[in-house]
């Protein structure tokens, strides 16, 4: 399951990540995912599902700076740290990633398809605001 997810991630996003952030960043993310224990992998997948649920709930409030949105952002940061590894997370990188979500139709399709139309823009707005406070 992990090997397939890594291969799909590489296929869909690898060239762009390597172009924007270098081979080392993509290789490190792949190694981090490959090195996860089954429990860590399951935890990451469960958190991903919970993030989508929280995104839908937060979007319903209409407030990207409200309590539901802040909870969403903290969950998303934790998910990134699980995938990027310890010591690689920064609010600036997180905010830049959020901007990339709305610029890339693949992410818009994923988030809007999972949490409703406008979810990607809401997530970006929430993350940019939250990251500015960190």
What positions do the PLM features span?
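Amphipathic alpha-helical "stalk" segments
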Residues: 1-134
């Amino acid at each position: 399951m992990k090997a397939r997810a890594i291969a799909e991630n590489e296929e869909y996003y690898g060239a762009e990540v390597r172009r924007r952030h270098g081979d080392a960043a993509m290789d490190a993310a792949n190694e981090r995912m490959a090195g996860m224990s089954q429990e860590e992998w399951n935890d990451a997948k469960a958190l991903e599902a919970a993030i989508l649920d929280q995104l839908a709930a937060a979007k319903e409030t209409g407030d990207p700076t409200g309590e539901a949105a802040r909870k969403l952002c903290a969950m998303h940061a934790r998910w990134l740290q699980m995938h990027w590894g310890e010591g690689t997370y920064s609010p600036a990188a997180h905010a830049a990633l959020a901007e990339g979500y709305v610029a890339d139709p693949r992410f818009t399709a994923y988030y809007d398809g999972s949490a409703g139309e406008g979810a990607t823009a809401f997530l970006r707005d929430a993350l940019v605001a939250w990251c500015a406070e960190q």
